Amino acid sequence: MGVRLGKTADKSVIVVEGRFDFQQHEAFRACLDEALERGGGLGLEVDLSWVDYLESSALGMLLVMRDRAKALGIDSIALLGCRGFVRQILVVASFDKFFTLR
């Protein structure tokens, strides 16, 4: 369980597993820092397929990620594996207006 960064030639994928809460803050930030260091021309995705719990601090981390990415010219961030409880929270919080939910 935790947060890790996957990289391909054209994008970075931050994978979150288990609970996405404040305990994941440092690991998420470290992965985000590394992903953004790769450059603004690359895509950025967050894979939430294995997330079973999502709290408000996770929503805040996603918004900070969006702001930092946008400042580097990354306009589109996809949230992958959004289903069930996780998708419901994201839609109720209107995150479907800020991110591509897949």
What are these model-derived regions, one by one?
Residues 1-15:
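Short beta-strand/loop segment at the start of cytosolic alpha/beta domains
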Residues 4-6, 80, 100-102:
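General small-molecule cofactor/ligand-binding pocket signal
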Residues 19-99:
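Amphipathic alpha-helical interaction surfaces in cytosolic regulatory modules
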